Amino acid sequence: MFIDTHCHLSIEDYDNIDYVIKNNLEAGVKKIIVSACNKRTLNAALDLSSKYDCVYVTLGYHPEEASLVTNEDLEILKKLLKTCKVVGVGEIGLDYHYGKENIELQKQLFEKQLSIAEELKLPVVIHSRDAVNDTIEILKKYD
């Protein structure tokens, strides 16, 4: 059995999700894990998991969202993570590729989401680009 462990089907780029899902199933992909990583895609991913038996989700805020995420957003995320067919927190982490102007915000958001994952006993999907050392240092603080 094949499982697609990381895709972004909840973004608006797909005109025909039914076709994409059908093709995956015909190719032998039995389960699809959709990673929602911003405010726009959280509910869209959950909707997909409700519509398709083969779709599961991970929910979280990508590091590029660090300056946009509020404490209220994190509370909403925490509630959504308790939803059926949620299998993890992600895609979360650090991304220094395009600049380092919001590093501290990224680190704070990453740690807050790791704390939520730890509390809810959920695995995480890590995004780390040009930030390996900081990512590892932060991860060492968590189980």
Residue ranges of predicted features:
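Mid-domain alpha/beta scaffold segments of enzyme catalytic cores
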Residues: 1-143
